[in-house]
Amino acid sequence: DYAVTGVQTCALPISQEVFVREQARSVAALREALTRPETIVSRTFWSAMYGAHPYGRQSTPESLASLQRDELQAFYQTHYSARRATVSIVGDLARAEAEALAQRLTEALPSAEGSPAGQIPAPAPVDVREQRIAHPAAQAHLLIGLPTIKRGDPDFFPLLVGNYTLGGGGFVSRLMKEVRDRKGYAYSVHSYFMPLAQPGPFQIGLQTKKAQADEALALTRSVLQGFVAQGPS
């Protein structure tokens, strides 16, 4: 019942008063986020990988402030169609009960066919580069990566298993053992794949003292290069 109420609430027309309030809240939240190093480095990382590609586009306080209520409502009516909805249900339900629940969950959504999503182009090859951004934070936030695989790639599970050894396995990963345990450069270091409709990023991330950022970066690259050359044991 809570889920049904939530969908029905989302389907209601948005008043101008509510739109203006939520727009102002979103602009303020983004302005605050843009002061934080983790937000800055993440946005810079995606822009460096994808440039003018749709994956590289970033919202700004100005772009959010320019959005009109009618534009938001039209987008919702076009793309949030019941015919395009996917409903996942887990529990002790018969098929007929699940179908009835799915019908209740989607009946408040627009009934139009919906506009097909545009084809996202493949990103252009990315050049190797290093960007440094001055910030008064006590720690340096480091990200390393590049576009790699898209959804449905046959190598996803081999890469997932391999990355568990490299940096996705927490305290048993090579990056954690070298960067944290052996050298003490960071409390945590991670790596993961993010497949998208087009090649999404492989990313390594960590935070460290500014004074040792160069050493931490060099060690992280060394571990990555060794893993690529030799693979897991």
Which positions does each model-derived feature cover?
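Single conserved hydrophobic/aromatic residue that forms the stacking wall/gate
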Residues: 1-10
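A common structural junction motif
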Residues: 9-14, 105-113, 222-232
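Non-catalytic beta-strand/loop surface segments
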Residues: 20, 29-83, 108-153, 167-214
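Helix N-cap motif at beta-to-alpha junctions
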Residues: 91-96, 209-213
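Hydrophobic side chains in well-ordered alpha-helices
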Residues: 98-101, 175, 216
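Extended amphipathic alpha-helical segments enriched in small hydrophobics
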Residues: 201-202, 206-233
